[in-house]
């Protein structure tokens, strides 16, 4: 419970920070931060392509997903995430920008802004936080949380989606 409270506090704190302040935060890039960022990007590609095998490769099955919205916090297991990712009836597309990555030893956190599209139409944007661990010499997403409130002021520097 303490872990959930801290995670929620950090995400709420991030929501109150001026985006121009966050754009000035740049941490040193190295082989480890690059490999952590790669895993997060691959996970988002798995979501966007309904690639269940890629999702299972990069996401630890026993983890959880936390969704934070104005109407409350929702939880689901990564197993449920896998089922949703495998669902070919919905076209998901998610992309991120300006990731901030920190690590020490076999523990890492990636924080980023993102936008999300359903069936080719913009749905929402927000902040997303990933907890990763190095397991059998490779990074895997264990838990992640995201805000899903914003439908305005979602000016992605990536421009409109191209499929």
Where are these regions (language model features)?
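Sec-dependent N-terminal signal peptides
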Residues: 4-12
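Short, low-complexity N-terminal intrinsically disordered segments enriched in polar/charged residues
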Residues: 15-49, 53, 57, 161-162
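Short beta-strand edge/turn micro-motifs at domain boundaries
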Residues: 21, 127-155
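Hydrophobic pocket/interface hotspot
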Residues: 43, 55-56, 63, 110, ...
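A mature extracytoplasmic/lumenal domain signature
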Residues: 59, 69-71, 112-116, 128, ...
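A short gly/proline-enriched turn/hairpin at secondary-structure junctions
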Residues: 64-74, 87-88
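Surface-exposed, charged secondary-structure patches
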Residues: 77-123
């Amino acid at each position: 419970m303490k872990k959930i409270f801290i995670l929620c506090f950090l995400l709420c704190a991030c929501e109150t920070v001026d985006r121009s302040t966050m754009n000035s935060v740049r941490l040193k890039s190295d082989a480890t931060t690059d490999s952590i960022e790669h895993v997060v990007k691959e996970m988002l590609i798995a979501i966007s392509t309904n690639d269940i095998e890629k999702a299972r490769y990069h996401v630890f099955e026993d983890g959880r997903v936390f969704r934070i919205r104005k109407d409350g916090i929702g939880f689901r297991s990564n197993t449920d995430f896998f089922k949703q990712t495998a669902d070919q009836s919905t076209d998901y597309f998610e992309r991120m920008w300006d990731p901030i990555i920190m690590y020490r030893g076999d523990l890492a956190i990636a924080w980023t802004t993102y936008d999300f599209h359903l069936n080719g139409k913009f749905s929402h944007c927000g902040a997303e936080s990933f907890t990763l661990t190095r397991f059998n010499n490779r990074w895997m997403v264990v838990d992640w949380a995201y805000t899903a409130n914003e439908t305005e002021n979602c000016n992605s520097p990536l421009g409109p989606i191209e499929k």
